[in-house]
């Protein structure tokens, strides 16, 4: 009887460890829906096919990006931006998705290969269970050796419906949001300034095989028995300083054509310069309840912690 009881306890603990985070019930904070303040664009108007063109289907404001054995797929914005509001509604592949990476990010690596900036929301398929996790990261001036990752569990199932993934990048701060809830803020002040992205960037939406990178050196590679892995993309919002159109020189305040005070882009205006009290409370909720990794707490990784961690 004792052996059976101990076996049952072990089984129970193991079962608990496999429970997806989105199976838990969360009461989410009420926040302003920033995504309601910007217009949506047609995919073809805002993006070009970056890679895997045969795995990209576009129908108006909806796109489907597919990862299979032949290739992943990626879109890149037709314009480069120096600050802006960037958002898309994504629906992730259901089922076993170990090694699958869906990325919504800003980068200028193609323009500045040795000193590039990057702001990432990366959605990582998990091994041994069907839930996904959120990873955020920031690079500036080619500082790729200093990973500034922070990782979060979802509070919903991202495979069952569309959800908003948003980046706010301006001269004040960078904010990462999921369903309009801020999960991370990276300010442009103090010790953070040396690591703050400052050059014009393009927006990318991609799905790719990240087995070697995302699953402990390939321990849990993509299993193409479950392919194709399809990511649905909708309601894309691109609002900011388009460098290509000459509305920004890459320095100074973010302005629309005209250059007057009244032409300040709202993304660099007062409403977006700081987080509201409700947004700060919501971010605190997300970080307390759902964040499970921060580079600033990883002392084994860094003998000398990045300056902003101090």
From Swiss-Prot:
Keywords: Apoplast, Cell membrane, Cell wall, Cell wall biogenesis/degradation, Disulfide bond, Glycoprotein, Glycosidase, Hydrolase, Membrane, Secreted, Signal, Transferase, Transmembrane, Transmembrane helix
Signal peptide bounds: 1-21
EC numbers: 2.4.1.207
Glycosylated sites: 30, 59, 141, 245
Residues at the catalytic site: 118, 122
Post-translational modification: Contains at least one intrachain disulfide bond essential for its enzymatic activity.
EC category: transferase
Disulfide bonds: 296-309
Transmembrane segments: 90-106
GO MF annotation list: hydrolase activity, hydrolyzing O-glycosyl compounds; polysaccharide binding; xyloglucan:xyloglucosyl transferase activity
Tissue expression summary: Expressed at low levels in vegetative tissues (roots, stems and seedlings). Predominantly expressed in green siliques. Expressed in flowers.
Binding site for xyloglucan: 122, 135-137, 145-149, 212-213, 217, 301
InterPro entries: Beta-glucanase/XTH, ConA-like_dom_sf, GH16, XET_C, XTH
One of the GO biological process terms: xyloglucan metabolic process
A Gene Ontology cellular-component term: plasma membrane
Localization per Swiss-Prot or TrEMBL: Secreted, Cell wall; Secreted, Extracellular space, Apoplast; Cell membrane
UniProt function note: Catalyzes xyloglucan endohydrolysis (XEH) and/or endotransglycosylation (XET). Cleaves and religates xyloglucan polymers, an essential constituent of the primary cell wall, and thereby participates in cell wall construction of growing tissues.
Note: In contrast to group 1 and group 2 endotransglucosylase/hydrolase proteins, it may not contain the ligase activity, and may catalyze endohydrolysis xyloglucan polymers only.
Protein name: Probable xyloglucan endotransglucosylase/hydrolase protein 33
Species for this entry: Arabidopsis thaliana
Gene name in the database record: XTH33
């Amino acid at each position: 009887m004792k052996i059976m009881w101990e076996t049952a306890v072990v089984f129970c603990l193991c079962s608990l460890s496999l429970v997806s985070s989105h199976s838990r019930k969360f009461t989410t904070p009420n926040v302003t829906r920033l995504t309601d303040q910007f217009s949506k664009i047609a995919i073809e108007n805002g993006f070009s096919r970056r890679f895997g063109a045969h795995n990209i289907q576009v129908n108006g404001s909806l796109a489907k990006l597919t990862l299979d054995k032949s290739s992943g797929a990626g879109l890149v914005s037709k314009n480069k931006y120096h600050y802006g509001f960037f958002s898309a509604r994504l629906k992730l592949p259901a089922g076993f998705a170990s090694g699958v990476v869906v990325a919504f990010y800003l980068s200028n690596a193609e323009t500045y290969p040795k000193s590039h900036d990057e702001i990432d929301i990366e959605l990582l398929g998990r091994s041994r269970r069907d839930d996904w996790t959120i990873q955020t990261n920031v690079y500036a001036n080619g500082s790729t050796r200093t990973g500034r990752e922070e990782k979060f569990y979802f509070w919903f199932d991202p495979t069952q419906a569309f959800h908003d993934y948003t980046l706010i990048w301006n001269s004040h701060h960078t904010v990462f949001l999921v369903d309009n809830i801020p999960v991370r803020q990276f300010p442009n002040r103090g010790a953070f300034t040396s690591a703050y992205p400052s050059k014009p960037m393009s927006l990318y939406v991609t799905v790719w095989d990240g087995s070697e990178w995302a699953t402990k050196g390939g321990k849990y590679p993509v299993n193409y028995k479950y392919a194709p892995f399809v990511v649905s993309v909708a309601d894309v919002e691109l609002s900011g300083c388009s460098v290509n159109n000459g509305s920004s020189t890459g320095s100074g305040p973010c302005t629309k054509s005209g250059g007057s005070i009244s032409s300040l882009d709202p993304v660099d205006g007062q409403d977006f310069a700081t987080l509201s009290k409700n947004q700060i409370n919501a971010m605190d909720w997300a970080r307390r309840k759902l964040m499970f990794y921060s580079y600033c707490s990883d002392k084994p990784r860094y003998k000398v912690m990045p300056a902003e961690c101090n």
